[in-house]
């Protein structure tokens, strides 16, 4: 009985630690500045990091970037960063995975060879590649990262 319990606990721990595709994180940053100043600073940080702004709405304090592509070996992901400023800053990712669809020889070169699939999971290495530069820039500007996930 004790062996089974220990075995199950060990198995559960191994499964939990081996999860290479965790859910996409959501970041929260707290600030002590004026809300509109924070909103415009968030836009400037994204521009500084090379992102193009797609939606910019000062009325609702929300903005999003245009699609950006990131690769991991053969997999390609398109992602959008969404920022919402309330009493804190929320950073969200919307992710699509590009899947190469092997078709018949009659449709070689067809644009339908790549399927876009919306993802709620993404490799942690890619999430870090996206979020780390953002975290560094926000910390430089005096914002505090409090919550992840």
Where would I find each of the regions flagged by the language model?
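Ser/Thr-rich, low-complexity intrinsically disordered terminal regions
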Residues: 20-149
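Sec-dependent bacterial lipoprotein signal peptides
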Residues: 1-17
């Amino acid at each position: 009985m004790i062996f089974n319990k220990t075995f199950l606990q060990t198995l559960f721990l191994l499964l939990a630690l081996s999860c290479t595709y965790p859910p996409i994180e959501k970041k929260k940053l707290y600030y002590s500045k004026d809300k509109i100043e924070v909103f415009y600073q968030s836009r400037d940080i994204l521009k500084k990091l090379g992102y193009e702004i797609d939606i910019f709405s000062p009325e609702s304090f929300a903005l999003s970037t245009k699609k950006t592509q990131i690769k991991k070996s053969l997999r390609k992901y398109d992602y959008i960063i969404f920022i919402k400023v309330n009493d804190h800053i929320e950073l969200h990712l919307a992710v699509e995975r590009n899947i190469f669809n092997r078709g018949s020889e009659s449709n070689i070169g067809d644009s339908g060879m790549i399927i876009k699939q919306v993802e709620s999971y993404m490799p942690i290495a890619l999430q870090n590649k996206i979020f780390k530069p953002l975290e560094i820039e926000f910390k430089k500007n005096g914002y505090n990262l409090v919550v992840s996930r």
